[in-house]
Amino acid sequence: MGWLYALHARSSIARGRALQANHWINGVCDQVIMLACLRQGLPAHEGRGVDDLPAGLRHSLAETLVRELDARELRRAFTAAVGTLLAEAQQVDPNREQRLRKTVWELVHTAHGYVIPLGR
């Protein structure tokens, strides 16, 4: 589901819907927290195990927090959220992560204004 939240986050950023983008970026992070907690054998419901995750992952999650509701900051947090999502997906299911990687990074690139040529 994280990729779907990423799609909505990217669309919200493009439309200038800052609070909505923040909502969807947080949704990406919620999916990362759930996956990481399950993988670590921690309570996943309502983020109850998040503070017990390894320090490096907690740091990565902190980087996904939106600090300001401007487009540049939303893109920064979105990029961090997608990177953290893919890193966790790699730990849980490398084959699925590989299938999602290109598409999800294209969402990030287009959120930053880069044009992805058709047919790629």
Please provide the spans of the model-predicted regions.
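Conserved nucleotidyltransferase catalytic core and NTase-mimicking acidic/glycine-rich helix/loop elements
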Residues: 1-120
